[in-house]
């Protein structure tokens, strides 16, 4: 199944149905998963390989009610499921934990509940996936020039090998994503990966310049929505037809090769 077909199945479905579609996919793969219920939702995660230490791959399955939830974040779910498939087919023993968090859109409640219950002691880092279905370049955030870590170095090296652009951003409009609870708990090698275009980069520069000039909120929103990445963000138009199979496959390949390089 193409990755885009997975996104299509998820499009517009209620969050509970999206979670059920993920578990059905995992059942079809014959993969065991852990469901972690907490006060307001339920996380899912899958442990792969015999290694005690795990490389985390983060996704979230909830969507904002107004949005179909394709790029945000059906794209990441499709890649996460593909990483599980690749691990199975390779017969790999490298330790990986793939997360499908609930309630990212309402204050990172799912990832916060995971960290509060399980902690971070068996994780070497987290590759968190957010908006990975459009574009031909990777944005790593929030990652400044001084930040370092095995996963970060490996991902950037893989991107160079695959001749894919890869840029660090201190901030990508908002720094809120499921990497946050892990960093706050003391896991420094945790960051978010987003797929972008050169046009997104140019508009981001314009956006931050406007912030420095203290532009009005309406003007900032006008600038932001010119970026392909944010044109359909949290909108009913965030549907699978807007996404690219190539972007999904490129992300999956980069994440998988990073996992292999870090084992």
Regions found by a protein language model. Give the residues of each.
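A non-catalytic alpha/beta surface segment that caps or lines the substrate-entry region
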Residues: 1-49
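Extracytoplasmic/secreted proteins, especially bacterial periplasmic and envelope-associated proteins
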Residues: 2-5, 17, 21-28, 82, ...
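Structural recognition of the beta-strand scaffold that forms the well-ordered cores
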Residues: 56-58, 97-100, 124-128, 190-194, ...
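His/Asp/Glu-rich mid-to-C-terminal helical/loop segments that flank catalytic regions of hydrolases
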Residues: 202-263
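Solvent-exposed, acidic/flexible segments
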Residues: 11-19, 69-73, 104-107, 148, ...
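Proline/glycine-enriched tight loop/beta-turn segments at coil->beta junctions
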Residues: 49-55
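Glycine-rich beta-alpha junction loops
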Residues: 130-133, 195-200
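Acidic/histidine-rich catalytic neighborhood of metal-dependent amide-processing enzymes
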Residues: 64-183
């Amino acid at each position: 199944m193409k990755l885009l077909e997975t996104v299509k199945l998820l499009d517009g479905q209620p969050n509970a149905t999206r979670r059920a579609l993920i578990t059905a996919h995992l059942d079809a793969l014959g993969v065991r998963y852990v469901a972690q219920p907490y006060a307001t939702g339920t996380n899912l995660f899958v442990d792969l390989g015999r290694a005690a230490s795990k490389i985390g791959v983060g996704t979230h399955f909830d969507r904002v009610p107004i949005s179909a939830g394709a790029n945000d974040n059906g794209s990441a779910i499709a890649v996460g499921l593909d990483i599980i498939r690749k691990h199975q087919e390779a017969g790999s023993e490298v330790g990986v934990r793939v997360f499908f968090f609930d309630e990212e859109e309402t204050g990172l409640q799912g990832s916060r509940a995971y960290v509060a219950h399980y902690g971070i002691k068996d994780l070497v880092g987290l590759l968190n996936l957010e908006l990975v279905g459009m574009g031909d370049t990777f944005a790593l955030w929030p990652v400044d020039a001084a930040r370092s870590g095995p996963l970060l170095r490996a991902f950037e090296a893989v991107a160079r090998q695959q001749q894919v652009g890869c840029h660090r951003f201190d901030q990508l409009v908002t720094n809120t994503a499921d990497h946050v609870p892990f960093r706050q708990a003391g896991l420094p090698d945790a960051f978010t990966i987003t797929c972008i275009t050169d046009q997104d980069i140019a508009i981001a520069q314009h956006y931050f310049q406007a912030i420095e000039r203290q532009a009005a909120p309406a003007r900032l929103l006008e600038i932001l929505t010119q970026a392909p990445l944010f044109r359909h963000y949290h909108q009913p138009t965030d549907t699978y037809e807007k996404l690219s199979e190539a972007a999904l496959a490129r992300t999956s390949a980069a994440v998988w090769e990073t996992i292999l390089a870090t084992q």
